[in-house]
Amino acid sequence: MGTPVKILVVRNHILFSVVVLLAVAQSSYLPPCEPVNETVAVEKEGCPKCLVLQTTICSGHCLTKEPVYKSPFSTVYQHVCTYRDVRYETVRLPDCPPGVDPHITYPVALSCDCSLCTMDTSDCTIESLQPDFCMSQREDFLVY
């Protein structure tokens, strides 16, 4: 009777080791949460053009987990790659009519962190528009 239990314990240990090894291997291939250069578009209601520029955003992989058994009484918190330290820059949009403030301020990521998503400052949706999407006429203004 002692042998089947011993084999089961060894199998569980091997299975656990394989799962841990695969998790570590997978995470080494995924880009970490860090500032990256990205082309983004900024626009403002009332101005006929959007400005396409280069800035630094937070992008990359954060370890998350989701329970196998979900309960309506529990809340799942997913960590996302988001801003830790940020600086704001202001640009002037071209061809804004009189009476419309042509200035717009956008964030520049200085450092990033895996934390809960703050909807006030981040787009936490599953499928969002591309960062360089414009609803109005595009004008390139590529700066870092």
Swiss-Prot record:
Any one GO BP annotation for this protein: G protein-coupled receptor signaling pathway
Family: Belongs to the glycoprotein hormones subunit beta family.
Residues with glycosylation annotation: N37
SUPFAM superfamilies: Cystine-knot cytokines
Signal peptide positions on this chain: 1-27
Pfam family, one: Cys_knot
A GO-annotated cellular component: cytoplasm
Origin: domain of life: Eukaryota
Function: Involved in gametogenesis and steroidogenesis.
The protein's name: Gonadotropin subunit beta-2
Location(s), subcellular: Secreted
Protein's gene: cgbb
Keywords (A to Z) from UniProt: Disulfide bond, Glycoprotein, Hormone, Secreted, Signal
Cross-referenced PANTHER family: GLYCOPROTEIN HORMONE BETA CHAIN, LUTROPIN SUBUNIT BETA
